[in-house]
Amino acid sequence: MIVHQQLPMSVNVASLDFLLIELVHTAKRLAEDRKKKSSSEKSIESDFQMLESIGFQVGRKITERLLLNRNRITETTDVMRFLCRELWPIVFRKPLDNLKTNRRGIFVLTDTYFYWFTKMTAMTGTEMAQITTPYFYFPSGFIRGVVYTFGYSAQVIAQCPNLPTCIFHVKFSPNPTQTSPGKPSTSESSQTDTSTRPANSQTPTTTRASSYTTLVSTSNQVSNEAEASAVETSANQAQNTEDATENEDRLPS
């Protein structure tokens, strides 16, 4: 009988990179084809949210695998440290560089050398937003999948201030999810999730991988700009009022 400890813990790095990047390219091609056929914006958006759903499942299953021989983590701060130090390197080759929190459910994760952006040519403004946006869906879904496994739901706001840096604002919902990890949300929990979703977000195709991701461009041409500003303001205020050693956790590269 095969036990979990005998399962392989890694795959070929090049194969994983090709797979993940090709997922993004496939979604972009599908979206472009729909756009040529004059499909609705909702149909085009669903192609990219497919990436978020895949990232959600990857994050959830990797977390479940690594938690087999660990004590249960319950605090949100410990969850985010576990994500930054142990889970992120599995998919993106290196730990996250910086983790900040206001101790009130808002975390700012910074990767100053995001692997997917390292080969991109330097660009700014609208051009950079158009190129980088599709690559945020998978990691944003990955973060939500990890958080979900620990019994929480969260909204993720992703942005690229400059290449190859990327920043993720993670805002935990006030009430933890009642659905046990690995099981689809019930109708009751689905209704709770809907109440925490931004007003302009679309209805997801699945309840357990519902979209909580907002993508922020450097030109601020986004429909959910107010929410992003609110999260950043809260994080900045907390950083100014609390001791830096309590609010900032610099992670080893």
Swiss-Prot record:
Bias kind Polar residues: ranges: 175-184, 215-242
Region annotated Disordered, chain positions: 175-253
Record flagged with keyword Phosphoprotein: yes
GO biological process, one term: intra-Golgi vesicle-mediated transport
InterPro entries for this protein: NO_sig/Golgi_transp_ligand-bd (IPR024096), TRAPP_component (IPR007194), TRAPPC6/Trs33 (IPR037992)
CDD domains reported in the protein's UniProt record: TRAPPC6A_Trs33 (cd14944)
Entry keyword annotation includes Phosphoprotein: yes
Modified residues (Phosphoserine): S180
Gene Ontology CC annotations of this record: cis-Golgi network; trans-Golgi network; TRAPP complex; TRAPPI protein complex; TRAPPII protein complex; TRAPPIII protein complex
Biased composition, class Low complexity, residue ranges: 185-196, 203-214
Keywords: Phosphoprotein
Source taxon at top rank: Eukaryota
Sequence similarity: Belongs to the TRAPP small subunits family. BET3 subfamily.
Protein name according to UniProt: Uncharacterized protein C13G6.05c
